[in-house]
Amino acid sequence: MDHTFSNRLLLVPLFQGFSRLDFLDIVEKTPFDFRTLKPKEIVVRQGDESHRLCILLGGEVECESESPEHTYRIKENIRAPWVMQPDCLFGLHNVYRYTVRSLVESQFVMLDKQSVRRLLMQYPAFQINFYNMLS
């Protein structure tokens, strides 16, 4: 197992509070999709459907939200570690509320919705951390 990856993942609030065995079990059994994005690459667009949980492990992104009337935009810069819009993954309106664009070379790990659902069912610590992020 790559210790750099596991150390970065442990900094993410979703993965805090796990026993070493549970954490190793998660890393072993969960299909993580790793991506490195170049500056100005778009991660997700506002209005697109959310099919996966995106976690920024390294780098910096810009979040841009446009009003429904297209009269104004709000931009915010966010650095790693960060879990991107977890509230959009499940629920009535599972679309992204803002566009996320990489500002510098950034490392992401993506978890599909099915994997997140499995983690929520099997690991109480993950479930508590996920609910804390939503509140």
Where are these regions (language model features)?
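Cyclic nucleotide-binding regulatory domains
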Residues: E41-V104
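A short hydrophobic beta-strand segment most commonly corresponding to one strand
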Residues: S106-S115
